[in-house]
Amino acid sequence: LEENQDQIKIITSNEQICSKYLICCAGLMADRVAKLLDIKINFQIIPFRGEYYRLKKHHNSLVKHLIYPIPDPNLPFLGVHLTRMIDGSITVGPNAVLGFKREGYKKFNFSIKDTLGFLSFRGFHNVLKKNFRSGVYEMKNSLFKRGYLKEVQKYSPQIKLNDLKPYPAGIRAQAVLEDGTLVHDFLFAESRRSIHVCNAPSPAATSAIPIGKYITEKATKAYNNLT
């Protein structure tokens, strides 16, 4: 990315695109992309893997709605919950496990660059101090399926270990401030010709349309101020 007085250039290995203004939703790479435009930021994106299971089909009639635990108000994670999908199947999850690769969707994916990146970040050390016990607990439940099951059985005790079947994981792009704060709200970074969505917690998907409208309004105002 290159920004000058007249435009922004998006340079890829195949082409170069010029634009008057850029709206960037880079997810797991949001902080790195913002830095490409020399935007000063006080946070880093740290990946948290959300692991799910799917229940066996005979449990499809178990719930008709979402069932959530009471979340920890100090953490931006909603906890393991039951979700009835569009096709009628039931998923369980997600947990929130520290990921060692930004785009590592498998349990043991690892990136030296990504891991060294957060290990050298002061904010991560502060997160660890504040949330060490809960972090170890999440890691244990990730490695040992019975621990995960106990979380589910708190509000659905009839579910057994062999009812939990594999299901794809997701990665949460969690913005962490230098003081160790896990950002609970939406976070934006801006340059003269760009706006970057750097943190989009729940209910980002549910509220996608009004959030999109909000971003568009901010971008339109910034663009109009250029002329």
Residue ranges and their predicted role:
Residues 1-110:
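Flavin-dependent oxidoreductases
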Residues 107-109, 113, 117-226:
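C-terminal catalytic lobe of FAD-dependent flavoproteins
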